[in-house]
């Protein structure tokens, strides 16, 4: 059952946030949505962390006119995996993004102009520190769980290591403790596509650059899929409207990348795309520690990991490595490898497969106290 119509909320914090870079950001606005009701002892709160280009609109619709529900609608609502009859679910837009939270497209109160490239470089850890301010605002001392895939999984890891006393569990899907050189190189090529678009104007554009961002998003879509899913979805089919020997004729997979790339331009700010890509590349759970083992020694809550066989962006061995280290430290951890052809996007699509395991995990967490 759907959660129905949901209104986005926002809160502005006048306090300044000291970032990992040493720079100061403030005031900070966070956009967020909530689903369900917070119980009397405030023990049923779940934070869902979104991925790179996601937003706070996790489930339901913001108006009757919306044609699509939130990005993970299938798992949120009465009787669903995140049962809103039992849980209070929160999803906030990360700082650096462009869906209502403070980012490069926001107005710098000191200048009265958009930040653009004067916006400071942010990290996933900075995002989580801002989320902690939101929990304080909502009067929530401790989360039942924090759950997320991809960059959302990185946020879950940061909660587990940086705020170990504020969570009872963490669930991380299709994620990594640090992106590989291959993942960084793909983001680098996406950046070049934007940097070489003359309409980007070194971040001082008035109208969102079109071609550079569309190409960058197309590169991203390739990493979200897999060889098997591309065969299943497109094969070698040629666009029926194009002639086979038309020089500019397209295979269906080309048309898909073009369509999704240019649609993305209408919904996402280019500078935000660049800043969040940088945050992904910089991510390292062990940042500030001698090793990943030292970082994970701070973990107190059980962590449940999910990896997907065809995910080549953050392949399963990277998740398994984290689970192995946590196990060696005597930390409560689960690692599940799910057979899937969907590639990195499997964390959004395989919910029927992982839902029973998540339910069992959360039931154990709730019974533990």
Curated annotation (Swiss-Prot):
Substrate binds at residues 217, 345. HAMAP family: MetX_acyltransf (MF_00296). This is Homoserine O-acetyltransferase. It catalyses: L-homoserine + acetyl-CoA = O-acetyl-L-homoserine + CoA. Keywords: Acyltransferase, Amino-acid biosynthesis, Cytoplasm, Methionine biosynthesis, Transferase. Transmembrane segments: none annotated. Residues 44-350 form the AB hydrolase-1 domain. Pathway: Amino-acid biosynthesis; L-methionine biosynthesis via de novo pathway; O-acetyl-L-homoserine from L-homoserine: step 1/1. Signal peptide: none annotated. Homodimer. Its main location: cytoplasm. Pfam families: Abhydrolase_1 (PF00561). InterPro entries: AB_hydrolase_1, AB_hydrolase_fold, HAT_MetX-like. It is an enzyme of class 2 (transferase). It is found in: Cytoplasm. One of its GO terms (biological process) is homoserine metabolic process. Its EC number is 2.3.1.31. Belongs to the AB hydrolase superfamily. MetX family.
